[in-house]
Curated annotation (Swiss-Prot):
The gene is cao-2. It is an enzyme of class 1 (oxidoreductase). InterPro entries: Carotenoid_Oase. Its cofactor is Fe(2+). Disruption phenotype: Impairs the production of neurosporaxanthin and leads to the accumulation of torulene. Its main location: cytoplasm. Induction: The expression is subject to photoinduction in a wc-1 and wc-2 dependent manner. This is Carotenoid dioxygenase. GO terms for biological process: carotene catabolic process; carotenoid biosynthetic process. It catalyses: torulene + O2 = 4'-apo-beta-carotenal + 3-methyl-2-butenal. Belongs to the carotenoid oxygenase family. It holds the Pfam family RPE65.
Amino acid sequence: MSPHEVIGTVPKNSTTFRTQADEHDDHEEALQNLRTGKYEDWPNEAAFDGLTEERGPIKIAVTGNIPTWAAGSLYRTGPGLYKIDTDAGTTFEMSHWFDGLAHTHRFDIIPNEEGSVDIFYSSRRQAEEMMDVIKKQGTWPYYSFGQKADPCLGFFAKAMAAFKGLREPSGEKWHNNVNVAVHVNPPGLEAVRNIVGTRKPAVAENDANVLGHRPELPKSIWVSTDNSTMKQIDPQTLEPIGWATQDVLHPELTGAMSCAHAQRDPDTGDFFNFNLEFGPKPTYRVFRVDASSGKTEILATIREPSVSPAYIHSLFLSPSFVILCIPTSHFGLSGTQIPWERNLVDAIKPYDPSRKTQWIVIDRKHSKGVVARFETDGRFFFHTVNSFEEKAGSDSSDINLYCDVIDFGSHEFIHSLYLDVILNRDSAAKKFYEDEQRARNSLAHLTRYHFIINPDSPTTNLPVTPTPDPKNHEAFRIPAPHAGEIPTINPLYATRKHRYVYSLPFRGRGTITDAIVKTDTVTREALFWDNPKGHTPGEAIFIPRPGGEEEDDGVLLSLVLDGEKGKSYLLCLDAKTMAEMGRAEVDFAIALGFHGAHVPSGRTLTRVEGPEY
């Protein structure tokens, strides 16, 4: 039997089971794949060129069995446009994957009369104003993640940009490229007084005509990125209808930077994030938006010479604490190098192995502010996984705090995400990965950090906890490909002790993620969905089965590019076995995006007591 034998109309993909004993060999094999150019036989160009929007909704073909309890709307966002023909007859091209112009997608999963589901797809571009400006000017007008600056931009233009700072004029907020994470009904932004620059939502009569039983829509959908701007989109039409900066939540949140992955308390719905203000005294303000009142409280203000402004993509939330982890990706000139370089990547200081990762633990229950600080070996990360707490012992008031994160040896990984490397233009991937240390630093690890918190600690002037051997803070570190990027867990286990992490590993077979893996953090076993060659998966979003009592009782939804055919499909995997249950195939390629959110229809997720691990 071939590993992809077709049973009925559903490809039966095999799974691969690996143990902790295989970690080293599998890691070295991934490095060998990079050295030998294994990725050259893994097509993914279709996800980066010739992409269009489909305002639809259109019905797409379903094969196999996607359970009816997965009904709802799956929203996904990410970059989707990389080339723009200008009025001058030239073509402007994005340099970095993260700078592709925003494109949001929706899959509506609707139970039908036959006991299965129908699936409808629609999508819409989110940065048409910026596209128009680029078309007219022939260049990128504002700050970016990694877009290479126009070489014709002179000293005076750079100096003026630095003088103006990072915040666009309010009339130009619509030009902001917001394309990373999806937030459903975030508190504090529902009131009209807090929404700046709103437009009137469009009316989508076609939705009702095509869908019949329209799925339940959320009150609001917002999209975020790594600055302090969020963009609102119509949950039905996907049209951009509003934007807001964090200062509408609190007047002190005036900094230009934040993180794309704010945290939500799974019980109260409270919203947590930070705001980063640059200048002579860079300042982090960690805040909470109360879900019941919509009011914002600043939990901690951190303005110290020893705490550098850094690129931070996500933060941690545990039952008692917000944990701000500051990796090695420090910005130069106290952050003011960003307007000089006009992008984040070039404004980050070169990697320095002597630079430590800083951990700042902030009380979120009793207004104590900063309650602990730690340092660990200098590493870089994009995505936190989860954070949970345990008592240190029956006779101790200390708290064991655990933080799971996908981290890297350095922030050089960011440079592997330039489109030249992803698409291996002029052998750029070969040139990047021929440096073995750089290749090693580009492979992810799932790391669990363990800290001991004394809840009776003073709230100010806390010393950094001495750490003669920073590795003492590591409970474990699981290397790629037994873990990978874009991690997810069962959402019912957020801020609780979890066992399973689902992620997209990098095995060196492609130039970006090339598999889906389920990692058991107790046994360190890894179970892979064995995708066919050239099938590049996106974020695996976990949908719990109603009434399920086991942590892995549910399904995973992942948008996959079939690079061989130049088409995409929505994949449904059994989260326990990693076997394919069904798929919904689209007759064209959909961009490789970043993150999404599933809005269930007809039910509310309920947290249950899970097993003890």
